[in-house]
């Protein structure tokens, strides 16, 4: 699944995901658009996703599981 798939499934706005992941909106947009992001940033996004997955009783994911994410490092 992509970042957007998770965001939409959770009913989160982009602002909500940014807040949960402690990242800036432009960083999130770059990740969604397929521009390179650092693995640490992907880790923050996945951390936010995993918290919600855990709340829903679902298994966690790794940043390498996110479709469409390009790493800068």
Predicted regions: what they are:
Residues 22, 33:
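Positions that flank functional sites
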Residues 34-47:
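Short, basic-rich loop-to-helix N-cap that marks the start of a DNA-contacting helix
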Residues 8, 25, 30, 40, ...:
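Short, charged recognition helix plus adjacent turn
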Residues 13, 30-31:
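Residue-level detector of alpha-helix boundaries and kinks
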Residues 1-20, 47, 56-67:
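A short, Lys/Arg-rich alpha-helix, primarily the initiator
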